[in-house]
C-alpha cells in the first residue's frame, strides 16, 4: 500500500513502455516514495557472460532522490572514515590524489584508482600515471566501479571517471549507506539541458555531493545477473533458479546478502 514514482528509469514516457520517468507504481495510497531503477546494469557483461552485471533498485522518501537525466556525470567517490568534503572535482586530479593520500596516511604510489576505460579519460590517466598510482581499469559497469571503494578492505581508494548520471545516483544510494563520499556534476549538451530542465534542474554547473543526490534514508538492492564483486550471478538448478541480492538499508544499518530460489515454470503476472 504505497505510491512510488520512478525518478530514474528506462527513459522518458515516450521512450519506454514501462519504468519510465514519472511513472507511478503501487496502490497510489499510503506513503510516497522515489524509486530509481536500472533493470540491467552491464548489458555488455551479460552478453559476454562477464562479471558484474546486475539489476539495481533504490527507494527513498518522496523528493529525496535526485532525478538525473540520462546524460554523463563527472564523478569522484571515496569510502568512509575520511574528513568531510575532502575532495572536489574542481581541485583537479593531482590535488585530489594528494589530499586523499594524506587523509589515508598512504604513499601516493600505494593508492588504487578505479577508472572507466574510455578515451575521454586520457588526460586523467596521464596525470595518474605521472603520479605513479595504481590504475585499475573497468570496461563498463559504472555502479560497480563506484562501489569498489567500500568495505573494510576495498579494492580501490577512489573512483575517478565520467559515467552515467542515473548510475551516479544509484551508486550514491549504496555509498551513502556506508558513510562514503561522492561528488558529481552533470555534463550536458544543449538538447540535454532542455531535458534536465524538465526534471527540475536549473543550475547546469552545480556540483552534487552525496547528500544532494540522496537526501535521507534509502534502501538499495543489487541482484546479480552474472557473478561479480557484489553478488553471485543467477544459478541454474535444473527446475529452479538461485538468485542472490546485495541489500542495504541506511537507517537500519542493514548490510546483507539474500538468496532466493525461484521455480522456472512459474509465470509472474
Describe the role of every protein-language-model region:
Residues 91-240, 244-249:
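An extended, acidic
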Residues 1-3, 28-33, 41, 49-54, ...:
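Short coil/turn connectors at secondary-structure junctions
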Residues 60-61, 65-71, 138, 185-190:
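Short, acidic/small-residue loops that bind anionic groups at enzyme active sites
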Residues 1-62:
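Flexible, acidic active-site loops/lids enriched in D/E/S/T/G that coordinate Mg2+ and/or position polar
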Residues 4-10, 35-37, 46-48, 67-68, ...:
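General beta-strand structural signal in soluble alpha/beta enzymes
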Residues 54-55, 75, 263-267:
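A short local loop/turn or secondary-structure capping micro-motif enriched for an aromatic residue
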Residues 238-269:
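Extended hydrophobic packing segments that form well-structured cores
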Residues 61-100:
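Glycine-rich phosphate-binding loop plus the immediately following alpha-helix
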